[in-house]
């Protein structure tokens, strides 16, 4: 079984790519002002629901939340557009989650650097 990719994994990858394209190129919501990426999509086995993790790159927390809320409010439009490009019997209901793992990683890296610099003195 080594090297085999499950149908669900393949669809998750397609969903991830297509959701980004739909938000960026088709919907063009003027409220999406910050740079973002779809970091992960996790669809249920029956494709009834999918968790969509969004990472938003912004130092302004208000703009970040406004961008996330704009993406989240377009969930039904995104699902409709997704149904046009994905070859699957059903397209999952999309649930968006803010992914702060990049920011957490940056904070940890800064902490480690500060610790290392403190050890040198």
Residue ranges and their predicted role:
Residues 1-49, 55-121:
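Charge-rich, low-complexity N-terminal segments
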């Amino acid at each position: 079984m080594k090297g085999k990719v499950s149908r669900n994994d393949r669809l998750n990858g397609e969903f991830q790519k297509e959701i980004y394209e739909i938000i960026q190129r088709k919907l063009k919501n003027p409220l999406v002002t910050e740079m973002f990426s779809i970091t992960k999509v996790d669809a249920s086995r029956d494709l009834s629901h999918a968790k969509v993790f969004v990472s938003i790159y912004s130092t302004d927390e208000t703009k970040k939340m406004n961008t996330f809320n704009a993406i989240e409010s377009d969930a039904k439009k995104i699902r409709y557009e997704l149904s046009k490009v994905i070859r699957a019997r059903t397209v999952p209901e999309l649930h968006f989650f803010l992914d702060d793992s990049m920011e957490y990683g940056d904070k940890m890296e800064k902490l480690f650097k500060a610790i290392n610099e403190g050890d040198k003195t």
